[in-house]
Regions:
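Helical element adjacent to the flavin cofactor pocket in flavoenzyme catalytic cores
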Residues: 185-243, 248-251
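N-terminal glycine-rich dinucleotide-binding loop that anchors FAD/FMN and/or NAD(P) in oxidoreductases
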Residues: 41-67
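Mid-domain catalytic core of redox enzymes
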Residues: 228-360
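Glycine-rich FAD pyrophosphate-binding loop
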Residues: 20-44
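N-terminal Rossmann-like FAD-binding beta1-loop-alpha1 element of flavoenzymes
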Residues: 2-27
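Conserved flavin/dinucleotide-binding core of flavoenzymes
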Residues: 42, 99-102, 316-425
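Conserved Rossmann-like nucleotide-cofactor binding loop
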Residues: 11, 33, 260
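Mobile amphipathic helical/loop "lid" adjacent to a hydrophobic cofactor/ligand pocket
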Residues: 61-180, 184-185
Length: 425
């Protein structure tokens, strides 16, 4: 069959990899690179040339089994990393690194702070009690749960919300609307509701784009870079893809782009597609790669892989800065930092790259829509893959592709109509 895949994030890449040996696959990508959030930049800092990631960074074999299997199949090398977390609050002046006692109490005054000890007590209580949320079908939003259980302001504003905002690249107000069960389930699955026995995380050696290079070196796929798709027109026999390259006919089309992008491409979207895809929103985020150390905690003992920042204005969202030297094991004294949504604080002369990404919003409407995955797949020769079907991470993207490929293969005997030829160039 002739199969079009629209979008080259992990869902599109994995779909193309699993199909290219059996079918004629065309991969459409609007950007000038393949990978989506797999985005590695070659930069020169301090006389050294380094590959720095600004999107997908970390994985671990236990919680990313499909991604790990793909890396093993491709011979992609990886190395262990740290997932240390720090927080600096402009409101309270509190700063800590949760990785060690020395980092936790880098501000020695916190040893005598009832507020700080209350935060730690609430942290232990949350680890224990959040397990009970896993038994609830729907349950409250995170904000409702925290209020009902009377968690302290310090725990909410100086630990849980900054951490969750960093994990999902989402504003704190959005995080408070997440289903509490959803957050607890993610944390439990990733061993984050425990003090010890957590997984070892890893990064791809030389930058995450190395796995994209490995795929491209091995597959037989028609790649359409810098070729935005304008619309997808379904017919009884397949689908026509209208792109910058013209109009082409395919037997099947896999929309491996964001849910809102997929819906925008379907001019003939039906009620089910509008309901499900329309319920999963995306949040835009600006990522800046830079060398400005002022975006990291003031005390170097508090520097961590993930550094959350709580602004003075209570209405302003938390932001996060990733120390890529720690995450990727990059050499040199100059910090290489990726900061989300705080470009105004970065010294312009120290900016290396400015990128724009988008991440799914996991509110109750989105979680309900995820349960309707099967209602969309394969109807009118159209399939939907993307990390938005899960928690929004790389493993969710590749898992969604795996589900689509399994379903597509199961119905192949019924899809015997001839493919369209090329309509226009």
């Amino acid at each position: 069959m002739r199969i079009a895949i629209i979008g080259s994030g992990i869902a599109g890449l994995a779909s193309a990899w699993w199909l290219h040996g059996e079918h004629e696959v065309t991969l459409f990508e609007a950007n000038d690179y393949l990978g989506g959030h797999t985005h590695t930049h070659d930069v020169q800092v301090g006389g050294r040339r380094m590959a720095v990631d600004t999107g997908f960074i970390v994985f671990n074999p236990r919680h990313y089994p499909l991604l790990t299997a793909l890396f093993d199949e491709l011979g992609v090398a990886s190395q262990p990393t740290t997932m240390s977390f720090s927080m600096h609050s402009e409101r309270s002046g509190v700063e800590y690194n949760a990785t060690s006692l020395d980092g936790l109490f880098c501000q020695r005054r916190n040893l005598l702070s009832p507020r700080f000890w209350g935060m730690l007590a609430d942290l232990r209580r949350f680890y224990r009690d959040a397990q009970l949320l896993l038994a609830e079908d729907q349950g409250p939003t995170l904000g409702q749960y925290l209020r009902d259980q009377r968690y302290g302001e310090a725990f909410i504003e100086e630990h849980l919300l900054p951490m969750a905002s960093a994990l999902w690249s989402s504003p704190t107000a959005t995080v408070m609307d997440f289903p509490a069960r959803y957050l607890a389930q993610f944390m439990a699955n990733h061993q984050m509701l425990q003090m010890t026995g957590r997984s070892t995380w890893r990064v791809v050696k030389g930058g995450s784009a190395r796995y994209v290079e490995a795929l491209r070196a091995r597959w037989q796929v028609r790649e359409r870079l810098e070729c935005p798709v304008h619309s997808v027109e379904r017919t009884p026999w397949g689908a026509r893809v209208h792109s910058a390259a013209g109009v082409e006919g395919f037997d099947e089309v896999i929309l491996a782009c964001h849910s809102d992008q997929a819906l925008a491409l379907l001019g003939d979207a039906d009620a089910i597609e509008r309901e499900v895809l329309g319920a999963i929103r995306y949040q835009p985020n600006e990522a800046v790669l830079h060398t400005d150390a002022s975006l990291l905690p003031r005390d170097r003992k508090a520097w961590a892989a993930w550094n959350a920042h709580v602004p003075r204005d209570p209405a302003a969202p938390c932001t996060v800065s990733y120390c890529m030297n720690l995450l990727q094991g990059l050499p040199g004294d100059t910090p290489l930092v990726v900061t989300l949504n705080r470009s105004e604080a970065i010294e312009p002369a120290k900016v290396l790259r400015t990128l724009r990404y988008a991440h799914p919003v996991h509110d109750h409407a989105a979680v309900r829509a995820q349960q309707r995955w099967g209602e969309l797949q394969g109807r009118r020769h159209t399939w939907f893959a993307g990390a938005y079907w899960g928690w929004g991470f790389h493993e969710d993207g590749i898992r969604s592709a795996h589900r689509v490929i399994d379903a597509l293969r199961a119905c192949e005997p019924h899809r015997l109509a001839p493919a369209f030829g090329e309509v226009a160039a």
